[in-house]
Amino acid sequence: MEIESWWLLAIPLFFGLGWFAARLDLRSGGARPRGQLPEAYFRGLNFLLNEQPDKAIDAFVDVVRLDPETVELHFALGNLFRRRGETDRAIRVHLNLVERRDLDAQQREHALFELGQDYLKAGLLDRAEDAFNRLEGSRYAAAALHHRLELAQMVRDWPLAIGHAERLERDCGERHGRDIAHYRCEMAAAALAQGTPEGRAAARREIAAASAADPAHPRPPLLAGELALAEDDPAGAIAAWEPLVRESPSFLALAAGDWLAAHAAVGRFDAGLAALERVQAEHPAVDTFAAIADALARERGQEEALAWARAGLERQPSLLALERLLALHAPLADEARRGDIELMQRVVQPQARRLARYVCRHCGFKARQFYWQCPGCSRWDTYAPKRTEEIERG
């Protein structure tokens, strides 16, 4: 079994800890000859060099005594346990430090901060939150507040997350406008999903607050248009989305179908189509392609939609666009050709499904729907409004 790479970094650390342990032994008036290291240290180092990290740690634990001067050894071991995923052992080490009465305030705060990180990695969120809350007013307060913000996001407590983010802005001079806009939008989306007048009113307030937190963010106008449609106000939806055409045109792909439907509802389909085609020319997206083809089929008939889709496919070859073209072509084909088209659809569809996913640019998590926060790594704004095929094509 190959030694884990982080153990290569641990070896110099334990040489240093051995020197420290020898000094402690001398101070304590031990019977060993001057400069001799504790036997457990050599035993642990032997295990480490023989690629037996579990036994090595057990031996090094034997070196660590309750002498107040061995605090740094405790911290080193606890952090190594956590890095290896042995959160139970890390918790025991750091909890022991927190409960010791001979530590000064700074050492106890350090131990409490490490313990909070142990709990967080172990998924013990309530205990982690309690540990970080207890660091209020300490030198670890800012770092603990970052973890408290992380915890609030994990449990989707958006009002609490807003409070923590605003404190980081106020007390630490950090910028969290975009984060706060997302939290507000999450609250707006939940309120809108209620389908009630009260929910829509709450959504409107949160969307306005999100826009104030980050005026350049594309998410609030997208939600504002969705809210307008929920209130049967297509003109209001168009007004909400129009800034995207100028400021974040690629994100209009996420509302392309509704954009065209809203323009059709107010008798301005041609104007809406022309605007979306200009966006598509500069920022091609499969979702926009499909939205235009579907809207043309609905408003002007299958043949015009098919002609437009064929021309678009020639300009920008795409397997996903081909799948849409075949779907448009099938109803117009005679019975003999329809069988061939359906065969082509069966061949194309599996690969098209693979290419139709969105991809997180941070962790690579792939999803069939667009996410503002990646389900894999929990980071915000890591999905482009483009499918895998478009990203791979560059």
Regions found by a protein language model. Give the residues of each.
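Long, contiguous interaction/recruitment modules in multidomain scaffold/adaptor proteins
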Residues: M1-G35, N133, G137, A142-H146, ...
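Alpha-helical segment of the N-proximal tetratricopeptide repeat
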Residues: P33-E69, A76, R82-E86, R92, ...
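Structural register within alpha-helical repeat arrays
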Residues: R43, L77, L115, R148, ...
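Structural motif corresponding to the intra-repeat A-B loop/turn of tetratricopeptide repeats
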Residues: N50, R84, A122, V155, ...
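Residue-level signature for tetratricopeptide repeat
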Residues: N46, L80, D118, L151, ...
